Amino acid sequence: MPQETAVGSLVTVTDDTFADLVLASDRPVVVDFWAEWCPPCKAIEKSLAELAGEFGDRTVVAKLNSDENPAATRRYGVMSLPTLLVFRRGEVVGSTVGSRPKTHLRQILTTQADL
């Protein structure tokens, strides 16, 4: 079984670890679908890392490279990057697409993840 990284840090998720780290999580999980070639994806990376530190005891903030993990990307219909999906108890409960300011990302964590 895959091991989670330390609380408060970004978790890397793959097609192989998605079920264990996202769907089976007892905490809400925000998954950032991103790609190396995507400038807006890189623009939100620092904010996501900071929010992982801020909310890490209550939620998991994860990153999934869409190019390297096409199964999860297809399964959830991700067509644009970055896409953030919020999961609770294995179900998608919220989403946002595109680069957003840190205040918007924080709002997603507090409202859609119900923190």
List each model region and its residues.
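Proteins that catalyze or organize thiol-disulfide redox chemistry
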Residues: M1-V30, A35-V60, D67-A71, R75-T83, ...
